[in-house]
């Protein structure tokens, strides 16, 4: 019962072939069996889950259900939810039970979706491996010696392991797309401002965007329909007409121009990634799409620009965690200043501290112009590159990561880890939508994904192209043994 896609589960619930309680119970049993080894979930509450499932069954019986009523979903631990611990995988918030619910979570609760639990992540969404979690690293379900990616590693892992039909993630520099690639699932980062950020713990406010993670592009489209929409509580939310993100799913690819950035098809990619890209190009050409070469020359500048800007925003956003109002507080201190220092030293992990220090430095007097202001100018150049490319193509095909998932505990420096985000970060700098879908496997049996990037608000076009690829391939249908 836990092998269904989100769409299949919804159809079976609506036709009353299964009940929401039966489906939730099946997932809870699978979670109890497999999660201790996987560590994909960090908070589970069976009583709350089954109460939501019973309410969904009542709604279905009364005939006022939506297509998602009764379908289970997992939430990355970055989304606040009333009555649930919302820790952001940090010691700083280990005892924080949210008094309110994020808008995007409320949207899904309003549809009648059933909460399975809270998924593991890199602390405050800072990381690419899920090893920065206070609760220990989540494992890759294809090989537990490897990382699931990050920062939405737990969400990717539970969907791949069939411990949830879908999950919510957030993407600041690739945190939906990179773990989706490493775990062999589909995930989309929408255009910045499409999904409300209210109630999503802030890392870098001008980059953060929530998105769906599921087995298929079709599932992501269905879920995004419920997630997206204007929210007056979020000042960065776009006020636009409600879209149907499933509208292009059946649209053929004949004549669609697919941009291939020459800077992304480089020697830096593993053979497995090159093969996955070629597999996808061949599938697109077979369906009538037209590959065209494009150039994104500022790609090499995206890493330094991103880590300056995101760290600056993180340093500001995380200043609120001081031990005064909520969260961790040092047990012993002499005065207020010592309490601040000890609380933050104890409450934050090493990667979070590193980024706060970088952010404080680049915003300090004498360095603002040299680093922060220059990075903002680079951000504009990166965005302009994409607009030049989209003048020649409809969508861009690119790698998601240079290789398959690395091993847990791999001896890599922070800079080496940052460089693994080379293909995802530029999209966040520009605020564009992008989707990762499975496209093959490494020689070691690990999934490899590729990404489709679209222009602003082209989510339906991206999802349609991905769906057409998945209709003609079965990488998304593979699951770990």
From Swiss-Prot:
Its EC number is 6.3.5.7. Disulfide bonds: none annotated. GO terms for molecular function: ATP binding; glutaminyl-tRNA synthase (glutamine-hydrolyzing) activity. SUPFAM superfamilies: Amidase signature (AS) enzymes. InterPro entries: Amidase, Amidase_CS, Amidase_dom, AS_sf, GatA. It comes from the Bacteria. Keywords: ATP-binding, Ligase, Nucleotide-binding, Protein biosynthesis. GO terms for cellular component: glutamyl-tRNA(Gln) amidotransferase complex. It catalyses: L-glutamyl-tRNA(Gln) + L-glutamine + ATP + H2O = L-glutaminyl-tRNA(Gln) + L-glutamate + ADP + phosphate + H(+). The keyword Zinc-finger does not apply. The active site is at 76 (charge relay system), 151 (charge relay system), 175 (acyl-ester intermediate). The keyword Transmembrane does not apply. One of its GO terms (biological process) is translation. It holds the Pfam family Amidase. NCBIfam families: gatA. Belongs to the amidase family. GatA subfamily. Heterotrimer of A, B and C subunits. Allows the formation of correctly charged Gln-tRNA(Gln) through the transamidation of misacylated Glu-tRNA(Gln) in organisms which lack glutaminyl-tRNA synthetase. The reaction takes place in the presence of glutamine and ATP through an activated gamma-phospho-Glu-tRNA(Gln). HAMAP family: GatA (MF_00120). This is Glutamyl-tRNA(Gln) amidotransferase subunit A. It comes from Neisseria gonorrhoeae (strain NCCP11945). The gene is gatA.
């Amino acid at each position: 019962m836990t092998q269904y896609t989100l769409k299949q589960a919804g159809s079976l619930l609506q036709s009353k072939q299964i009940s929401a309680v039966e489906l939730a119970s099946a997932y809870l049993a699978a979670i109890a069996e497999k999660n201790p080894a996987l560590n994909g979930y960090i908070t589970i509450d069976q009583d709350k889950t089954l109460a939501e499932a019973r309410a969904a069954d009542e709604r279905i019986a009364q005939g006022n259900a939506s297509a998602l009523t009764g379908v289970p979903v997992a939430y990355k631990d970055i989304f606040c939810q009333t009555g649930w611990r919302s820790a952001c995988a940090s010691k700083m918030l280990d005892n924080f039970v949210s008094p309110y619910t994020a808008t995007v979570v409320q949207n899904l609760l309003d549809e009648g979706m059933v909460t399975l639990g809270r998924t593991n992540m890199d602390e405050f969404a800072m990381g690419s491996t899920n090893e920065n979690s206070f609760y220990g690293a989540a494992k890759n379900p294809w090989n537990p010696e490897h990382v699931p990616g990050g920062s939405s590693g737990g969400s990717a892992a539970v969907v791949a392991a069939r411990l949830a039909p879908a999950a919510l993630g957030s993407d600041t520099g690739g945190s939906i797309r990179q773990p989706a690639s490493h775990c062999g699932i589909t995930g989309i980062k929408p255009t910045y401002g499409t999904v409300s950020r209210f109630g999503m713990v802030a890392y870098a406010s001008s980059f953060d965007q929530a998105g769906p993670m599921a087995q298929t592009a079709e599932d992501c489209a269905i879920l995004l329909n419920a997630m997206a929409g204007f929210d007056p509580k979020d000042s960065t939310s776009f006020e636009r007409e409600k879209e149907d993100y499933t509208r292009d799913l059946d649209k053929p690819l004949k004549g669609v121009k697919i941009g291939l950035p020459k800077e992304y098809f480089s020697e830096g990619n593993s053979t497995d990634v090159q093969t996955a890209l070629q597999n996808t190009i061949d599938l697109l050409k077979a369906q009538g799409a037209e590959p065209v070469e494009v150039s994104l020359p500022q790609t090499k500048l995206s890493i330094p620009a991103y880590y300056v800007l995101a760290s600056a925003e993180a340093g500001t956003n995380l200043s609120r965690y001081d031990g005064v109002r909520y969260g961790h507080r040092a047990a012993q201190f002499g005065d207020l200043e010592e309490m601040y220092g000890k609380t933050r030293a104890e409450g934050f992990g090493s990667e979070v501290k590193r980024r706060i220090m970088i952010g404080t430095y680049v915003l300090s007097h004498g360095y603002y112009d040299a680093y922060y202001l220059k990075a903002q100018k680079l951000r504009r150049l990166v965005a302009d590159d994409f607009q030049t490319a989209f003048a020649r193509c409809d969508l861009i095909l690119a790698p998601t990561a240079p290789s398959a998932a690395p091993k847990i505990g791999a001896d890599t420096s922070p800079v080496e880890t940052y460089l693994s985000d080379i293909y995802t970060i530029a999209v966040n700098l520009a605020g564009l939508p992008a989707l990762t879908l499975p496209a093959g496997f490494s020689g070691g049996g690990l999934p490899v994904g590729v990404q489709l990037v679209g222009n602003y608000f082209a989510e339906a076009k991206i999802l349609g192209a991905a769906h057409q690829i998945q209709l003609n391939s079965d990488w998304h249908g593979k699951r770990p043994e």
